[in-house]
């Protein structure tokens, strides 16, 4: 029987980050569009830096805007408290009953990730947390997923990645892991969709799928 491990995007934080990026950029006299920011979803810091600097020109100070974005995002998160996507709690409970370990693998920094999980009251539900600041190469490179599998002590080919971004799917494929797509904000190509084990409408459809996979 195969052991399936969850790596997921479990909080409604993407919209917070977009708000924070746009607000921070305005303070520095720049306009960041939602469409441009969606292209950075799940990608490495280096990719995001190159994309935004190319789009906004030489006067754009990426690091200064990013640091202010972090401050704004933390403020929003603490004031509004992130909530889990519907189905996350049920999925975690199902995994615990089945004895399947779960991990978080996210491009977000470790401090922000731990804050998100703690405020959502699911921090203790994960056996491993791997963040973008812990690996040399971000998504779409496989490093973040490979490190998560290593920390769990499970072979990559026995892992199941649940993703909502194309760069995340590419990283999981490069790691040799099975993929499930639950689309969220950004577009995902038909090629990426077809490479997945399943494409679900919401996290609520995940527990039944996991149950079928383990039988």
Regions from the PLM with identified roles:
Residues 10, 84, 102-105, 137, ...:
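Conserved SAM-binding loop
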Residues 24-25, 44-59, 116, 148-149:
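Helix-loop "lid/cap" segments that line or gate small-molecule binding pockets
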Residues 1-15:
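Asp-based phosphoryl-transfer active-site loop
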Residues 52-90, 98:
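Metal-dependent phosphoesterase signature
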Residues 93-96, 109-215:
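Asp-based, Mg2+/Mn2+-dependent phosphohydrolase catalytic module
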Residues 18-38:
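Conserved phosphoryl-transfer catalytic core
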């Amino acid at each position: 029987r195969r052991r399936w491990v969850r790596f997921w995007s479990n909080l409604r934080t993407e919209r917070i980050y977009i708000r924070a990026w746009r607000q921070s950029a305005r303070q520095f006299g720049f306009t960041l569009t939602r469409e441009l920011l969606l292209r950075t979803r799940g990608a490495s810091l280096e990719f995001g830096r190159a994309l935004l600097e190319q789009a906004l020109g030489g006067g754009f100070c990426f690091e200064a805007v990013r640091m202010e974005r972090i401050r704004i995002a933390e403020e929003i998160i603490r004031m509004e408290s992130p909530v889990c996507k519907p189905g996350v709690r049920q999925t975690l409970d199902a995994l615990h009953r089945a004895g399947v370990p779960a991990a978080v693998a996210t491009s977000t920094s470790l401090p922000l990730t731990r804050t998100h999980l703690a405020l959502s009251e699911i921090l203790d539900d994960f056996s491993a947390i791997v963040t973008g600041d812990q690996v040399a190469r971000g998504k779409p490179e496989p490093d973040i997923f490979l490190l998560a599998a290593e920390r769990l002590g499970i072979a990559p080919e026995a892992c199941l990645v649940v993703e909502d971004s194309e760069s995340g799917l590419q990283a999981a494929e490069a790691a040799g892991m099975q993929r499930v797509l639950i689309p969220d904000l950004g577009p995902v190509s038909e090629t990426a969709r077809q490479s997945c084990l399943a494409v679900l409408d919401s996290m609520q459809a995940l527990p039944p799928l996991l149950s079928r996979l383990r039988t």
